[in-house]
């Protein structure tokens, strides 16, 4: 995909009310933000608008309140932290109906360069149904719409798509621009050898991604829970490991397709297994492609990790989506760590496709060694699968 959308730099924002859809869906513990990467990611767009004398109206969802007012999902902590990060008060419009008296009064009193944040858009049941009445209310606050929430770009909601019906000037912010340029270039014009690493539990979540990437990559590496479905497709025993019976045939087809296209498809040759899914479970090395009855695979083994690391070191572009094992359990994080370390040392263009891989990379301390960590789990998956993202399609073309 070639990046052809208008950005905030293509429109005159001076003195204008600009409604910005951000992704402030951050983890909260007792009202404290435990990971503020998404807030940091939104700052360049917000600062640009402030410096160019726009009146900045921010909106986002947080969690899944499903149309109910849930105080623990209020965006108040986000407003407080943003005020600190921007060194300027971000006025919080605390309306349970999102566009209420507080929001309207705050917008009315805005001066150029001011910033307000609306309440959680998913407090409204209409938001996820993309219903016109709520889209219209949101749009009534602004004159220009900016979407900078890559994490929800694959959702057609009021605050991502619906508002563009009523605010014809709709452009993207810096974060979406950066995401599309990195992911788009990696897929359409990669420096080669180009390697994709796929992990996580389900093959079914990644079917489009595998199909699309097999048209583009030189090497495809598979780990995580989904690798057991591939192991079954190769005729190996997998004990009590997770498997998608209805995807074994598909895995066989993909193994054949890779062979046909001359693509290196790397699958595990040894495993770390255990007899119960538990953090305290003892890791046992299974130095074989077969897993014994009563045992389940929890991570790739050291031989596999070495083969994968060598392939990574030979690459010029690497995209990674999904961990190699149950990295949340210390005993089963070595495979994910080995892949992360190899990527950090590769000197290649390294792109992490959001979600669990982003969490793993940051947790293991390799975040600053990656070229780009995507802010969108589902969105980056759909994009890598070659699908249109409604939140992007709705924006003005250049």
Swiss-Prot record:
List the catalysed reactions.
(2R)-3-phosphoglycerate + ATP = (2R)-3-phospho-glyceroyl phosphate + ADP
- Residues noted as binding ATP in the record, renumbered to the chain: 206, 297, 328, 354-357
Q: List the disulfide bonds.
A: none
A biological process (GO) annotation for this entry? gluconeogenesis
Recorded E.C. number(s)? 2.7.2.3
Q: What are the protein's GO molecular function terms?
A: ADP binding; ATP binding; phosphoglycerate kinase activity
Chief subcellular location: cytoplasm
Annotated residues for binding of substrate: 23-25, 38, 61-64, 122, 155
Q: Does the keyword ATP-binding apply?
A: yes
Keywords per UniProt: ATP-binding, Cytoplasm, Glycolysis, Kinase, Nucleotide-binding, Transferase
UniProt-listed PANTHER family: PHOSPHOGLYCERATE KINASE (PTHR11406), PHOSPHOGLYCERATE KINASE 1, CHLOROPLASTIC-RELATED (PTHR11406:SF23)
The subunit field of the Swiss-Prot or TrEMBL record says: Monomer.
Q: HAMAP family of this UniProt entry?
A: Phosphoglyc_kinase
Q: What is this protein called?
A: Phosphoglycerate kinase
Q: Gene name on record?
A: pgk
